[in-house]
C-alpha cells in the first residue's frame, strides 16, 4: 500500500527554517506552526520546536506543540467571533460603539451582559495599551483589533449561546479527527461574564493550532 502525505517538501522546509529563526530571534522557549491549504484543508506544513528525533533514545520532550499544546490564541480569535456574528445574522452593519474601556453588568438569571456607563464589580476591559480609538463602526473595530468592539458585539448582538455553538461548529474545544496524532481538546472557560467576553478576543479559553 502507498502512503501519500499532503505535506509539501518546499513548504515544510521554509516552515522549519522560519521556526528556527523565530526561536533564535525572539529567544522564546517554543514555537509551532501549521500551513493549511484554505480550499481543501490539506496540511502542507507542520512543525514545532523544540522537536525530537525518533532515532534518539534519550528523548525528554515528546510533545507535539501544534496538536498537543492548548493555548490562548489572542486576537486571531476576533475573526472567528466576527464570522459567527456574520453567519448567524447578528452582525450590526453600519452600527457604531465607543471604544477604549468596557464596563458592564451581568444578569445571572438571563445570562445577559450589558454595558455600563460606570465601573462595576466586574473587571473593566480595555483596548490594547489603553488606546482610545473614539467612536468606531464594527468594521473599523475589526480593523483596529478592538477588544471593546468584541465586548460590545457579544453584549448587544451575539448571544453567548450562539457564540458557543459557533466555536464548536468551527471545530474548537474538541478533539480533531486526524489519524495517528494525539491532540488536546482545549479548554472552554465561560465561568464568568469576563471569560465569555475574553474568549471573544482570544483569552480565557484555550485551543490548539491544529483546531
Go through the PLM ranges and name each one.
Residues 7, 31-71, 83-211:
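Beta-lactam-recognizing serine transpeptidase/beta-lactamase-like catalytic domain environment
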Residues 75:
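Short alpha-helical catalytic segment bearing the HExxH-like zincin motif
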Residues 1-31:
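Conserved, well-ordered alpha-helix/loop/beta-strand core segments that scaffold catalytic motifs
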Amino acid at each position: 500500500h502507498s502512503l501519500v502525505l499532503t505535506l509539501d517538501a518546499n513548504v515544510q522546509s521554509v516552515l522549519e527554517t522560519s521556526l528556527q529563526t523565530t526561536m533564535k530571534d525572539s529567544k522564546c522557549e517554543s514555537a509551532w506552526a501549521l500551513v493549511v491549504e484554505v480550499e481543501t484543508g490539506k496540511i502542507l506544513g507542520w512543525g514545532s520546536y523544540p522537536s525530537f528525533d525518533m532515532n534518539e533514545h534519550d528523548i525528554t520532550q515528546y510533545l507535539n506543540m501544534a496538536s498537543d499544546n492548548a493555548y490562548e490564541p489572542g486576537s486571531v480569535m476576533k475573526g472567528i467571533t466576527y464570522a459567527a456574528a456574520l453567519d448567524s445574522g447578528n452582525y450590526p452593519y453600519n452600527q457604531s460603539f465607543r471604544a477604549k474601556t468596557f464596563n458592564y453588568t451581568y444578569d445571572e438569571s438571563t445570562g445577559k451582559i450589558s454595558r455600563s456607563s460606570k465601573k462595576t464589580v466586574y473587571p473593566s476591559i480595555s483596548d490594547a495599551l489603553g488606546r482610545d480609538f473614539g467612536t468606531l463602526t464594527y468594521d473599523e473595530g475589526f480593523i483596529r483589533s478592538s477588544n471593546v468592539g468584541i465586548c460590545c458585539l457579544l453584549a448587544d448582538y451575539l448571544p453567548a449561546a450562539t457564540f458557543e455553538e459557533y466555536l464548536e461548529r468551527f471545530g474548537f474545544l474538541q478533539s480533531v479527527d486526524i489519524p495517528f496524532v494525539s491532540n488536546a481538546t482545549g479548554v472552554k472557560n465561560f465561568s464568568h461574564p469576563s471569560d465569555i467576553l475574553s474568549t471573544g478576543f482570544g483569552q480565557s479559553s484555550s485551543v490548539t493550532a491544529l483546531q
